[in-house]
Amino acid sequence: MTLTYFLVKFVSFLTGEELEIMPRRKKDHLMRWGVMGCASIFFALEGYIYLESPDTNTPLVISHRGVSNKNGVQNTVQSLEKTAQLKPDLVEMDVQETKDGQFVVMHDANLKSLARINATPQDLTLDELTNTDIYENGYQTKISSFDDYLERANALNQKLLIEIKTSKKDSPQMMDHFLEKYGATIKKYGHQMQSLDYHVIDKVLAYDSEIPVYFILPYNSVFPRTKATGYTMEYSTLDEYFVNKLWTTDQKLYVWTVNSSESFDKAVRLGADGMITDDLEMVQSQVTMAQDDPEYTELLLKKAMEFFDF
């Protein structure tokens, strides 16, 4: 009964409306001031603890396609070496199967944009692809094999977010072959995986459920029920409804592409665990500022809202 009385009085204090649970007594005002005092002490202590030891996780900063500020050709060893110097938490990159069942690092379904060749990665062998020149941002280099890219990332101690891109031209054993060849190394060096194809997610989880694997959702329509480690979403489609649903699970959230302070603020507000960006230095700077100069009132308000589940 004492706890009930305390809670009712606390709500009355916050709302300004009296909630009667028993006939008023002359000493009620003493209890009211006691409740106010306890509440003040509680929030002061809670606020101090929050500011001294914030319970929010620092989001991972992730390079989009292995580049930052157009520092090279996307998805190449050449750019990886430059981008790794900026020390991102992860480098997101794309992998596709070749005609001869090997793997290259390539985002586009067609080589026309980067290589000026009207062909898909699945139309050419690994040797043909790795001898093909590609151009972007004023740079020129060769298409990188996944073997070379992975080996260089490991040497640089750079963790990857490996996106598997599938196509109708892929071999039926594509994922089995990929995991048999690279799965142990991916786990050993702490790399992560993601895909728009849930078949890939299933294959990775069946191979080793300890390898983090994210399901990419291009649109926010219906909240999925999957066994994925988490979801990768385009930040502009993300909303409170999705995040509230996500909080009922143990899954995480990555967002792309965070290239402005506005998109950064939204990603932070919605509790993103990772931010994929074309501008590593901007996002890293924003993260540092958020850590070093927290706004006292904003933090207390956030904690109060979380406490009362507003």
Give the ranges of each region predicted by the language model.
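Phosphate-group recognition and catalysis centered on beta-loop-alpha active-site segments
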Residues: 1-310
